[in-house]
């Protein structure tokens, strides 16, 4: 589940391309010498009493986001509005609640301010009906990639419950801006969107994207949808060493399908077999298998693991032991891949198997032997705790 928690917070994660809107004031706010001000100046300019901040005062303060610059990652560059709001929070100032500020800020002429409004829509319990209605009205005509990214992030868990928002998320997956498409890949992969018709197909299409960051997100988050249709395209990518930088994301996508930490609910044998097949890649290299893939299923929930293991009849610790042993013996592989092969054995295999694994590790003499042996000792120490 992908959640955005909180009521009043900054826009660090919701920033387009450099925009000419930086410097334009919003909502009728007075002109200020923003570039030469500090956060203290900003608070003094707009707030009379920190313990009794009015809605109008706070909206005027937030409207100064319009002076902030949006960078190519669709994030706001460092700005004093962020700092001023943080300082007010640190000072225990009484700030208006999101339910009061969202709708008026969504109507701002400033895209930075509209982005802030979207960032305040989502809570742990999801967006309210009134906020969703206001958001949908704005999004009918919204074209700016910065605002769309913020909206996708805020509404990412709503696609399976609201057809109109679902349609918006699917359209964002086709946006011309790669940053928006990446955010759509993350959002569509929310477990809340399992019932969104078209989500799986959109993720599979994003796996073919021209931008590797988009592909990486699609490979990783698609598995959260619990649909075996994503196994084949992930498996094909894992066979291509040219995509080695994407391999750990692909394996994480598979792991969601068969291991699903911490809930341990999913039991896809096809995804498990694809994972094991990847670890059997020969002859291997310093990049393949990816070291982060080896550690992608080493955490486990003491509450749910045993029940999962009973259902996951495909999960064979003897097989896992042999596969990890193959990694640690293969001198073609990177030292981290070999060293971290100790971790799945420690997490899932028997004490006897772990000890036998140590015998092999301690007999290594190649240039990476000490690193691997040190990693084994770290796992041994944890098991003895």
Task: Pin down the residues of each PLM region.
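Sec-dependent signal peptide recognition
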Residues: 1-4
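C-terminal motif of bacterial Sec signal peptides marking the signal peptidase cleavage site
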Residues: 10-13
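Amphipathic alpha-helical scaffolding segments comprising HEAT/armadillo-like alpha-solenoid repeats
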Residues: 39-40, 52-72, 93-107, 126-140, ...
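Structural detector for internal amphipathic alpha-helices that build alpha-solenoid repeat scaffolds
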Residues: 33, 40-49, 60, 71-94, ...
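Bacterial signal peptide processing site
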Residues: 15-17
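Terminal, low-structured helical/coil segments at or just beyond the last alpha-helical repeat
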Residues: 355-385
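N-terminal, intrinsically disordered, polar/charged segments of Gram-positive cell-envelope systems
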Residues: 21-30
């Amino acid at each position: 589940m992908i959640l955005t928690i909180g009521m009043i917070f900054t826009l660090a994660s919701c920033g387009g391309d450099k925009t000419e809107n930086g410097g334009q004031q919003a909502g009728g706010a007075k002109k200020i010498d923003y570039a030469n001000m500090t956060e203290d100046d900003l608070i003094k300019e707009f707030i009379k009493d920190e313990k009794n901040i009015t809605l109008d005062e706070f909206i005027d303060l937030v409207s100064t986001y319009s002076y902030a610059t949006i960078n190519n990652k669709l994030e706001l560059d460092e700005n004093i509005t962020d700092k001023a709001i943080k300082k007010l929070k640190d000072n225990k100032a009484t700030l208006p609640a999101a339910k009061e500020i969202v709708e008026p800020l969504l109507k701002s002429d400033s895209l930075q301010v509209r982005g802030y409004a979207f960032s305040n829509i989502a809570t742990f319990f999801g967006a309210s009906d009134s906020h969703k209605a206001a958001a949908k009205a704005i999004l009918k005509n919204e074209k700016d990639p910065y605002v769309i990214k913020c909206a996708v992030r805020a509404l990412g868990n709503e696609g399976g419950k609201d057809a109109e928002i679902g349609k918006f998320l699917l359209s964002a997956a086709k946006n011309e801006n790669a940053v928006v498409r990446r955010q759509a890949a993350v959002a569509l992969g929310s477990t809340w969107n399992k019932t969104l018709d078209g989500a799986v197909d959109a993720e599979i299409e994003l796996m073919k994207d021209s931008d590797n960051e988009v592909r990486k997100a699609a490979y990783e988050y698609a598995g959260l949808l619990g649909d075996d249709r994503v196994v084949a395209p992930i498996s094909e990518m894992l066979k291509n060493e040219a995509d080695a930088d994407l391999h750990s994301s692909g394996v994480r996508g598979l792991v969601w399908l068969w291991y699903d930490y911490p809930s341990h609910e999913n039991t896809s044998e096809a995804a498990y077999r694809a994972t094991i097949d990847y670890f059997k890649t020969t002859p291997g290299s310093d990049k393949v298998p990816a070291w982060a893939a080896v550690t992608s299923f080493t955490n486990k929930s003491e509450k749910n693991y045993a029940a999962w293991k009973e259902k996951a009849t495909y999960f064979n610790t003897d097989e896992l032991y042999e596969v990890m042993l193959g990694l640690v013996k293969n001198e073609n592989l990177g030292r981290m891949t070999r060293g971290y092969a100790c971790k799945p054995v420690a997490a899932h295999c028997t004490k006897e198997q772990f000890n036998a694994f140590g015998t092999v590790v301690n007999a290594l003499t190649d240039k990476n032997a000490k690193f691997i042996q040190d990693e084994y000792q770290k796992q041994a120490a944890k098991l003895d705790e």
